[in-house]
């Protein structure tokens, strides 16, 4: 019996690619660059399974295909806002993701950005590399204290709770949360957290706000000029969720005009292109989407995607089916 044909749209860690070849007839994207819509349409007609990433835009145009061969999109990553789910369903394509395995590493990056933005680490490094440091002095590059402050978390799933754990138990922070669903008293009690009914209210009562909600149309520009104007003085905003969650023009304006103190971004709207107005903000720390970028996590993500794909072709329901 022939193996199902699997197309992997970006290069995976070697160990995972080798494991994939044992179970599937694998085609790799050797150029390791994002696919065009035409490339994706051709792939949907050619392969039994495709493993896309956040860099692959699977919008309705990409799904405008006849004689589809693809039966499953085993997404490499937990977020799947780059996949138009209704279009996939219309073509009878199963969609899976890779939750759980990247929660800790993404939470670590959120805390990294929080500390860097608060303590002006990016500015300090740039000063040193430019040979502009003139020595220690009491008023040099004063930042914000993290320990004991109030941390607001928007989106309280696995990653949001991992950040709460680090903030509360590691830095003695008070935890505020916003979630569209009611969080159980047991989970709130674990972090001594308070749930807020609106983003605006949370922004006004937090020193730091970290975003951990899904992307997609429902959360596009969830952080915008209107609610940033209601933020507590000195707020520091962190985004490791999805770029579209933040109105980047509004963020740049808030940074320039001291509406908020600083920000840290690991994700961007339209990445890998970065909005030029963000580049000009000295009080903004930026990383190139490194949330899950550890050897262990990237391998676990690949193995999880493969497990979903194997289950599907065995006739079982994949454990991480989202559509």
Where are these regions (language model features)?
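Rossmann-like dinucleotide-binding domain for NAD(H)/NADP(H)
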Residues: 95, 234-323
